[in-house]
């Protein structure tokens, strides 16, 4: 048996290849966006496969590495690229997008209640000087968000940073294509499991799995099925699986993780 590891982050592949070196050629690494999972796996000659695991979103390494610019905990270049080969950075978006587009990104990808205020504050600040660091952006967000919302468990900049990261890396579209591609390379009886970390991701996975496991799609008023639609998979998780208390003790960042799984028919 072989494992194919796909990631667009060269640092992640380097760490994984060193950790899994004892397994030799049983592990193959491909530097790519998992939206291209089908082409990547077929390129290794491994398709069809027995299982697919997608671990979505930013990694602890990326969050904890100041140079990558993913976190408001450090004052570092406003980068957020998972694939450092791409040109688009968070600084590019913050300094070039129109105020309305920034508001849309914060609202759509961050579900940020103060999206308009934050976008307006960014536009005002960059008119005087380009916004280049995570510290500068965090300062702007703290200025824009009313002070009474500063004391909660979630930092006021969390949703803005999430939204920019998703936009820079086109994460939701990658997820949609990765789900379709992953199901496309599974053999009958093959299983796919997906771990997500926020509601936007989980909603996409939930809907994709529901669609794949749905049979008849005729209107409810039809007395008999005429569509002939057959389910391609069956749900293995009726509800998302969340981390246990023991898991949270070992890994507090798993508190928002949700796992869903299906089996191809």
What role is predicted for each listed range?
Residues 1-265:
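S-adenosyl-L-methionine-dependent methyltransferase catalytic core, i.e., the SAM/SAH-binding region
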């Amino acid at each position: 048996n072989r494992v194919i590891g796909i990631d667009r982050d060269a640092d992640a592949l380097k760490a994984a290849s060193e950790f899994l070196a004892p397994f030799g050629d049983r592990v193959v690494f491909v530097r790519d966006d998992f939206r291209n999972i089908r082409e990547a796996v077929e390129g290794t000659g491994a398709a069809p496969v027995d299982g697919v695991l997608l671990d979505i979103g930013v990694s602890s390494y990326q969050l904890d590495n100041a140079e990558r610019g993913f976190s408001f905990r450090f004052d570092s270049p406003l980068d957020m690229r998972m694939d450092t080969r791409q040109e688009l950075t968070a600084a590019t978006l913050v300094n070039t997008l129109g105020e309305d587009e920034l508001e849309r990104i914060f609202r759509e990808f961050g579900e940020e209640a103060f999206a308009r205020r934050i976008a307006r504050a960014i536009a005002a600040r960059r008119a005087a000087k380009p916004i280049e660091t995570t510290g500068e952006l965090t300062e702007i967000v703290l200025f824009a968000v009313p002070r009474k919302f500063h004391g909660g468990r979630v930092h006021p900049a969390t949703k803005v940073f999430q939204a920019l990261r998703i936009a820079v890396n086109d994460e939701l579209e990658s997820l949609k294509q990765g789900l379709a591609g992953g199901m496309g390379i599974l053999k009958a009886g093959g299983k796919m499991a997906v771990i997500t970390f926020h509601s936007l991701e989980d909603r996409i996975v939930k809907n994709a799995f529901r669609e794949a496991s749905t049979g008849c799609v005729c209107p409810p008023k039809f007395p008999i099925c005429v569509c002939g639609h057959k389910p391609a998979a069956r749900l293995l998780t009726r509800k998302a699986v969340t981390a246990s208390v023991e898991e949270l003790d070992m890994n507090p960042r798993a508190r928002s993780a949700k796992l869903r799984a299906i089996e191809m028919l």
